[in-house]
Amino acid sequence: MSDNDTIVAQATPPGRGGVGILRISGLKAREVAETVLGKLPKPRYADYLPFKDADGSVLDQGIALWFPGPNSFTGEDVLELQGHGGPVILDLLLKRILTIPGLRIARPGEFSERAFLNDKLDLAQAEAIADLIDASSEQAARSALNSLQGAFSARVNHLVEALTHLRIYVEAAIDFPDEEIDFLSDGKIEAQLNDVIADLDAVRAEARQGSLLREGMKVVIAGRPNAGKSSLLNALAGREAAIVTDIAGTTRDVLREHIHIDGMPLHIIDTAGLREASDEVERIGIERAWQEIEQADRVLFMVDGTTTDAVDPAEIWPEFIARLPAKLPITVVRNKADITGETLGMSEVNGHALIRLSARTGEGVEVLRNHLKQSMGFDTNMEGGFLARRRHLQALEQAAEHLQQGKAQLLGAWAGELLAEELRLAQQNLSEITGEFTSDDLLGRIFSSFCIGK
C-alpha cells in the first residue's frame, strides 16, 4: 500500500438508494475513465454515459464527473461515477475498477487526508468535514460548515500572525541590546502581548461553545429507587423513554436519551436505583450506574421530597456524596413538589444547585433545562461560531498557559530569551490546530475516524 496509489471508494452510504457514487482519486483516475467510460469527460461538466465491464457489456449508466488535478477536492485527478444505488450494481462496478492495476480501496478518511497533504484544506477544515456529517443539530451543522469554510482556521491564523510579529519585536530586543531604547520595558511588547492574550481568550470561549455543540454534555440521573429518575428522563426527553412504575428497582440497566436544549446536545442517562442489590441482575445494573456517574459531566441527584426535608446532599445521603469524584458537579433535584407543596424553582445549598420540581407533572422541569444550559456556559445567541474538538481545546489551553508564563517573565525578570521561548511554544500549539505542526501519528488517528469515501 502506497500513498501514491490511485484510490477508490463508495462515497454514498452502504445499502439501497436512488443514487450510488464511486469516487476515484490519483494518477490512474484518467485510465479508469477511459477504460470504464470509453472516453475522458469534459472537465467539471456532467456527462451521461454507460459504465462498461471488461467485455464491453454495460454494468450501469449514469453521470460521470471529471476533475483534473490540481483543481479538485484532493488536489489529484478525481473521477466520480454517479449511478444507481443498488448494492449489487455498485459492487460490480467497484470490482471492475479494481481490475485496473494500481488501484486499491481507500482507507477511512484518505480522500480528506490527501486534500490536507496537498494543501487543499488545513487540518481543522478537514476535521470539519467529519463533524458536518456527524452533526446532530442545525446549530452544530452550521458551525461545522463555518469551520469547513475556514472560520476557525482564520481565527487561529490571525493569532499565529500576531505572535509572529511579537516574536520579531522580542528577538530584535534580544539581538540588539545596546540600542538606546529598551524594547522590553517600553510598554509596547506588553501591550501587544495583552492584545494577543485577549484575542486568544475570545477564541477559547468560542471553542468551548463549539466543543459543547460537537461533544454534548453527559448528564447522569442518580439516586435511590423510586425517587423519580425515570420520570425525569421522560420529562426531559418529551416522551415515554423509560418504564415508570411504583415498584422499586424497575430500572435495572442504563437508559440513554439524546436530546437538545436550544441547540445544545445532551446525553441524559437514567440509572438503576442505588441500594443494596437484591439479586445479580440488579447488582450489575448498580455497578453500571456507578461507571456512568464517574464519567459524567454533571450528576442530577434525585431526591424523593416526600421522604426527607433535607436539602444539603451531604445530609441527605452522605455515603453517596462521599463516593462521588471530587470535582464532579452536582445538582440536587427534590422531586414530587406536587405532593409536598414545595415552592418550585432553583436555589443554592453549600455550593450545589437545588431545584424543586415535579417530574410527573412537568412543573419546574423548564427551570432544570435552563440550569443545565447555563451550567455548561452554553450561549444560544452566539453567531458565526465554529465546532471544536478536544485536541483543539487542549492546544488553545496550552497556548494560553505559555502566554501567561511569558508575560510573567516579561514583567518579573525582563527575561527576553525566556519570553521568546514561551511565545514560540504558544505559536507551536496554535499551529497544531491547523496542521502546520503535526505528528504523523496524530494525522493517522484523525483521518482514521472518517468515513471510507471521505
UniProtKB/Swiss-Prot annotation:
Sites where the protein binds Mg(2+): S230, T251
Cell compartment(s), UniProt: Cytoplasm
Residues at which GTP binds: 226-231, 245-251, 270-273, 335-338, 358-360
EC number(s) from the headed UniProt entry: 3.6.-.-
Enzyme class: hydrolase
Cofactor(s) for this UniProt protein: K(+)
CDD domains given in the database record: trmE, TrmE_N
InterPro entries per record: G_TrmE (IPR031168), GTP-bd (IPR006073), GTP-bd_TrmE_N (IPR018948), GTPase_MnmE (IPR004520), MnmE_dom2 (IPR027368), MnmE_helical (IPR025867), P-loop_NTPase (IPR027417), Small_GTP-bd (IPR005225)
Magnesium keyword on record: yes
UniProt keyword Magnesium, yes or no: yes
Positions of the TrmE-type G domain: 216-377
Binding positions (K(+)): N226, T245, I247, T250
Any GO molecular function: metal ion binding
Record text on subunit structure and interactions: Homodimer. Heterotetramer of two MnmE and two MnmG subunits.
UniProt function note: Exhibits a very high intrinsic GTPase hydrolysis rate. Involved in the addition of a carboxymethylaminomethyl (cmnm) group at the wobble position (U34) of certain tRNAs, forming tRNA-cmnm(5)s(2)U34.
Similarity section: Belongs to the TRAFAC class TrmE-Era-EngA-EngB-Septin-like GTPase superfamily. TrmE GTPase family.
Protein's name in the database: tRNA modification GTPase MnmE
Species whose genome carries this gene: Shigella sonnei (strain Ss046)
